[in-house]
Every structure is written in C-alpha cells, then in structure tokens.
C-alpha cells in the first residue's frame, strides 16, 4: 500500500537528488529523499565548488596525438588510469572518443549549453529560498597559463565561446594577473577570468542548506537501500531503516551508483566514472588566494574554501569501487606549492569521489522508457553541482506535467535503447 505521506521517492541525496526533492516539495508533492548515507557526503562533498556558466563544452576525450601519447605513459596530473581496468573500460572509452570528435563535440555543446545557461540563475533561486546565498561567491574563476602557446589558443577559444554562447570573460596579461593574485608565483603568462560562473566555498554546506529548506517544507530524509527499489502495482516500494516505503513515483538520482537500482530494473546504461581526489591546506603566512584557479598545463585546481585551500585533481579512469590511488594528488602537490604558498595539510587522508559519466557527454534526465512513474537524473560527469538545480527543476516539471523550461529530448534515457 502506498504511504499516504509519500507521493515521490527520490533515491540519492547528492546535490542533484536534493534539488529534485526540493523542487518537487515546492510544487506540493509529498517527497521522501533516500540515501544509504547522510546528505551530500559523496561526490557532492568534495568537488571543486564551481557552478560553471562557461562550461558549455562538456569535457571531451582528447583527439590530439600528442595528448594521447602523454596520457598513454600514465604520468600526467590531469589524467591517470588503472591498467587493470582498461579492458572493462574499453567499450566506454571507444564510444567517448567517437563522441568527442570535433564536429560531434560541437553538436553536443549546442545541446549541453541549453542546460548550462540556466545553472547560475537556478542555483540563485534555490539558495535565496534556503538562506544559503552566503555560500556563493561572485568572483568567477581563473584559467591560468604557463606558456604563450596555450594562452593564445585558449584566448581564441574564449572569444569563440563569447560569440557563440554569450559566455563572458576577461583576457588577462601577466601583469594584471599578478595584481589580482599577488601571492601567486610570477611564472604565469596570462589567464582567462571567467566572469559569469560563481563558486561555492562549502559545497556540502550548500547541499545541506537545500536539504533543510526541503525539510522545512515538509519533506523527509531517511536512509535506505536503493537496490531494494521494486515495482509495487502501479507504483514503487523499497526498504528504509524506518521500514517499508511506498510511493507512486520514483526518481533515481544516484550519480555513480545509478546502476545499483537501474540494472535490477533491466536498464544497462553505458556509465563509467572519472574518479577525483582533494586535499585541503592552510595558506602559508599571510598569503591569500582570491580566485579559484585552474593550472591549465599542469592539470589541477586550487580553490579557497571555508576549510582552507582545496586542491582537486583531474580524472582517474578506474572502476568505481577499486582501491584508492591518489597518485595525481601526489604529483600535483609539489607543483601547486611552487605556484602558491601552501602550508600543512588539513585532512588526515585524501578525499576521493566519483564523477558519473556517459559516453556522449550528456546527462540522463527524463522518464524511464519501459516503466511508468520512474524518472532518471544522473550522469552529470564534472557538472553535478553546476547542473543540480537545473536538473531538479526539469525533473519536477516533467513529473508534475508543467511545460519544461528546457527541451528535455537531448537528455532522454531512451537514447541508449
């Protein structure tokens, strides 16, 4: 029997699931949010803290032979792989490479940008409601360069994105960059200052604030087993620590763990993960980092957080549950110390998260093709935080029958058969 206090069960209390639950609760639905752990404790805890309005091109697989050769030696910071995982990952990587061909990548960017263009405004709306606007900083972020060749290439790209997608930026020479970041070593030749994005100085704090807003509206958060989701007549049932739960509609927003629920229902999405690591540091002396910053040629990211300076790494291609191997963090730390005066580590061990990725670089958002009253919201890769609020609104509109504010067709789960 359906729980009279539950219209919708949302599986997954990362930033995407929380935003889905909050948007549905705002629309008068009785929602229960379910996770095996606490809210925003996995990938949504440790990201780089960017809401990337400039991120109109999803992260593609390189086609440049030189880059492929460098990655093949497995010695870079921005990409690392487990050799033992390559056989399992090969079908995904092949499809990812094909979708990343320049012409195809440009097509996907046009589709992807329709979500990205709303990312800041949708988060602003939820943050205002949740009393969480203080987590959001409007400084933009810096993409910094060590060589004139890379700088000039990316400057031209930024100008194209301005013309095609309306993404604004400032192109900085070394002198201006040194003025706005005086504690960064003078080894850089310029930067792109992306001015439209915003950053978050405590990603988990933002997610928990959204959760509190959801609960103030009457929503419930419980712990439960996503693998127990099953059809119950015309609705759904599952097990939670508080007992059986039934609902008319279910949303799977489990990020890299989506297959825990989807495979049992007969869906085999071509998902893989890009794992990533972070570590916090105290800034040495009176040093201050004013902007989040990507060291482009080296492949790591520094961001000022409430806890300290967060160093995040690039993509690790591995099986989701494989042993942690923070190799990239070890490679990045001495280079980051040379760029900015980092003092001691503030975490006892590196944090690791997993980014859920599809080979065509678009998230999976929409109704399940073979089940009624089942919706999917996962596969956001590097942009779970960026697209969390957008996805929450879009899923809520699809469930309630409102006209969707973004055409959902490109992100349909049905595209994978």
Predicted stretch roles:
Residues 26-46:
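Glycine-rich FAD pyrophosphate-binding loop
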Residues 165, 297, 338-417:
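C-terminal catalytic lobe of FAD-dependent flavoproteins
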Residues 90-212:
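Rossmann-like flavin
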Residues 47-50, 55, 59-99, 228-236, ...:
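Active-site substrate-recognition segment that forms the wall
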Residues 172-180, 222-236:
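A conserved short coil-to-beta-strand element within the FAD-binding core of flavoproteins
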Residues 6-33:
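N-terminal Rossmann-like FAD-binding beta1-loop-alpha1 element of flavoenzymes
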């Amino acid at each position: 029997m359906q729980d009279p206090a539950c219209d919708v069960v949302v599986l997954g209390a990362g930033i995407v699931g929380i935003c889905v639950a909050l948007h549905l609760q705002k629309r008068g639905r009785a929602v229960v949010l379910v996770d095996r752990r606490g809210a925003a404790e996995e990938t949504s805890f440790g990201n780089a803290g960017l809401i990337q309005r400039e991120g109109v091109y999803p992260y593609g697989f390189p086609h440049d032979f030189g880059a492929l050769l460098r990655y093949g030696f497995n010695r870079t910071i921005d990409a690392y792989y487990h050799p033992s995982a390559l056989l399992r990952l090969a079908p995904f990587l092949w499809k990812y490479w094909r979708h990343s061909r320049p012409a195809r990548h440009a097509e996907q960017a046009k589709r992807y940008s329709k979500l990205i263009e709303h990312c800041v405004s949708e988060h602003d709306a939820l943050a205002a409601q949740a009393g969480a606007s203080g987590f959001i900083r409007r400084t933009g972020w810096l993409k910094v360069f060590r060589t004139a060749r890379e700088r000039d290439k990316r400057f031209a790209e930024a100008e194209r994105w301005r013309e095609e997608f309306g993404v604004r930026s400032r192109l900085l020479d070394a002198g201006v960059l040194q003025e706005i970041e005086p504690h960064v070593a003078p080894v850089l030749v310029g930067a792109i200052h992306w001015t439209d994005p915003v950053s978050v100085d405590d990603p988990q704090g933002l997610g928990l604030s959204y959760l509190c807003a959801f609960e103030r509206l009457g929503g419930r958060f419980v712990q439960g087993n996503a693998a127990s989701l099953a059809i119950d007549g015309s609705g759904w049932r599952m097990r939670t620590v508080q007992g059986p739960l039934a609902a008319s509609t279910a949303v799977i927003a489990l990020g890299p763990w989506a297959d825990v629920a989807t495979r049992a229902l007969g869906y085999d999405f071509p998902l893989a993960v890009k794992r990533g690591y972070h570590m916090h540091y105290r800034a040495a002396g009176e040093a201050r980092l004013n902007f989040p910053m990507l060291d482009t040629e080296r492949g790591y990211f520094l961001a000022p957080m409430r806890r300290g300076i967060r160093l995040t790494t690039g993509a690790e291609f591995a099986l989701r549950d494989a042993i942690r191997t923070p190799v990239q963090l070890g490679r990045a730390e001495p280079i980051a110390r040379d760029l900015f005066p980092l003092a001691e580590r503030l975490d006892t061990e590196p944090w690791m998260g997993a980014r859920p990725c599809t080979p065509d670089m678009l998230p999976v958002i929409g109704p399940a093709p073979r089940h009624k009253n089942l919706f999917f919201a996962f596969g956001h890769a590097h942009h779970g935080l960026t697209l969390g609020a957008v996805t929450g609104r879009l899923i809520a509109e699809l469930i309630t029958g409102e006209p969707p504010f973004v055409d959902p067709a490109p992100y349909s789960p049905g595209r994978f058969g």
